[in-house]
């Protein structure tokens, strides 16, 4: 099984930029179902290498599986920052790119997408389904440690102080940029499961990626308040197509968020992960989460 890393250029620009970095595995047999993993924040797709690999193996390479990060988080786009709204648009453009350039636009009516969103990637996925269901066919949305409600409340006091002010965002980004590469490498060795993912992530960490990560976090706190009408609309119309996995000790999505969802949608597929799995599950627990996702999708969405 080969994990492919690719730099693509979208057919439509956002702030004049089209560069998008993706990872993917290809199916061994033809299938019209495509699985899209949408990153959280940081929106660096390389963090999801192990998760995509395990998904591919658990599905016996039946489906093309893509991991896509966020525009501006690759560290190669200078002097521009992108909001969470622009990241939603970016994912629409990415799906459009796939249909036109990977699968042939004439066959687009046959292509069906499953979206797997982590953290704010869940919020982005739900918005994409809400806004673009007439353009694309969606079979399911899997919401992993989802932050579609009151994101600001889950931030630590230090992070709140950093992200809410432009001066502190710039200052921290500058500081991170000048940390010696050997220090960054050693930190990544400690937190990432493989040399492959460590090298890929390290190549994208600089002032510009840090500034985009922090700016996007700021716009998340501004945009993500109570569960909004778009999210509720998707929940009400597609509840049996949705899976929600919450963390038991996740400060971004405390127990009250889980309880609220269970109360509002008692028939929903809303569950907890194991107690030791953190919000940033991709660092050390990709296998467990990927196996649960593939199990649920196989039993509920892909059973035919």
Curated annotation (Swiss-Prot):
It is an enzyme of class 3 (hydrolase). Keywords: Hydrolase, Lipid droplet. GO terms for molecular function: lipase activity. The active site is at 119 (nucleophile), 250 (charge relay system), 279 (charge relay system). Its EC number is 3.1.1.13. It comes from the Eukaryota. One of its GO terms (cellular component) is lipid droplet. GO terms for biological process: lipid storage. Its main location: other. The keyword Hydrolase applies. It catalyses: a cholesterol ester + H2O = cholesterol + a fatty acid + H(+). It is found in: Lipid droplet. Probable serine lipid hydrolase associated with lipid droplets. Has low cholesterol esterase activity. Appears to lack triglyceride lipase activity. Involved in cholesterol and triglyceride homeostasis; stimulates cellular triglyceride accumulation and cellular cholesterol release. Belongs to the AB hydrolase superfamily. LDAH family. This is Lipid droplet-associated hydrolase. It comes from Dictyostelium discoideum (Social amoeba).
